[in-house]
Amino acid sequence: MTSRRRAASTALAGLAATAVALTACGTGEQAAPGADDKIKVVASTSVWGSVVQAVGGDAVEVESIVSDPSADPHSYESTPQDAAKVTDAHLVVFNGGGYDEFIEQILGSGNQKPTVEAVKDEHEGEQNGHEGHGDQPAAPEEHGHEGHGDQPAAPEEHGHEGHGDQPAAPEEHGHEGHDHSVNEHVWYDLHVVHEVADQVATELGKLQPAKAEQFRQAAGQFEAEVGALEGKVGEIAAANQGKPVIVTEPVAHYLVEAAGLQDVTPQSFVKAIEAETDPSAAAVAEIQNAINAKQAVAVIYNPQTESPVTRNVRTAAEQNQIQVVEMTETLPEGKTYVQWMDTQIAALQNALNQNR
């Protein structure tokens, strides 16, 4: 299997912004569903599958290719069965940015159909401006895989309040030498999730126009729930602005940023973890010293990428009475996206409350 970071580093070279991108083409499309048929949607992961289900309800049949909570979409290798599911789908929803490259590979092989993509590479269209994500052009440009047709005008822009200013076109960074402004884990960016729900509702409405209003209302309800999560994150930011945290992997980067927290993880450590190499003795010593000096109020820990090094970080934090907050990469079984995020946001809030 390929390295979980190799695909991401290739696809993210030159990634300028997170945005929702929409693709629709005629070649190879599945016939539109009948008025009483379920719309077949393939999602790359159960995270995006949960968003689709919230918007589509009983009108959709959602197939998430990566649904095992312990699976790693970075290195997932698609099967002929996966390709057949994509071919048979009316709509495909995926993350992009190299995170779920297997979907992009299938789509690139001729299965061209309407898609909603959560990450937009600068090579695929105009850069999108999010307030605080950097000074970039205003709206995502709809784009396609090679051979895809043009689409109507781009969706209206949304701002990211509370995100730090970043350059419009950052230097190329993969996960080897990861820059914190470039991160494909956009489901931790609640605003992007809001945009994805909007686009899903739009595409479902095109497939079944008689239910377009139903999808719009469902998206509105989902977005209200996401908005409530944003409110909770805003409360965290108001009470904890600038407080330092250490992360074992920046999977929750956008949430940490929105919460007003300062990631003080030594860059040498981050670069090694992201490149899936063992951190140098100096990097390990640097993060150990930071923890021993209690230079962070919490450690954000991804148990799904646990290694002896990260376990030692966790142990050191616990020995120094520094709160450890688990934030995972994939959706736990039996939980919706909103339930999952709510649980993690509450855990972060509780940990920070311990340091007041």
What name fits each language-model region?
Residues 2-356:
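Extracytoplasmic metal-acquisition and chelation regions
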